[in-house]
Amino acid sequence: GSDGFVTQTNDDQTGTVMRFRDMIDGTSNVIALGEKRLDDRSLGNYQGDDNEGYTSGWDHDVIRFTNVQPRVDSNNGGWGEQRFGSIHSQMFNALFADGSVRPISYDIDGNLFSLLGRRNDGQAVSPP
C-alpha cells in the first residue's frame, strides 16, 4: 500500500522518503508494526506466509494488513492469511509510530482498525 507506515514504491520512486511529518494523523494513531497471525500447527514447517526471514522485503511473510480483522493464531493447517494476530487469546500487541506498544483486541471495530493502518487519511480516531 501507499498510505501506511511502511509503503511500497515503484522503481521511479526510488529514494522517496516518508517522514514523520507526513503522518498527518499523528504518530499515536498509526500502527507501525504488530504481531502476525500464524498457523501454530505448521510452525517449523512450510507456511506460505511464514517461510522467509524478516529481511525478505515486500513479501507476504512480513506484510500485514489492517483491512482484515485481526485473529488469534489458528491450528487448522492453513496460513495466517496475512492478518495481524498472535497466540494471545484476546489480543495482539502493536507498536505505534510514537513508540508506544498497545494491545489491540480481536474485537476491534473494523473501520477503526483500518484507519489505524493509514498515516494520512485525516480521520480523527481514538486508538485503544
Q: Residue ranges of each PLM-predicted region?
A:
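Surface-exposed loop/linker segments characteristic of extracytoplasmic
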Residues: G1-P128
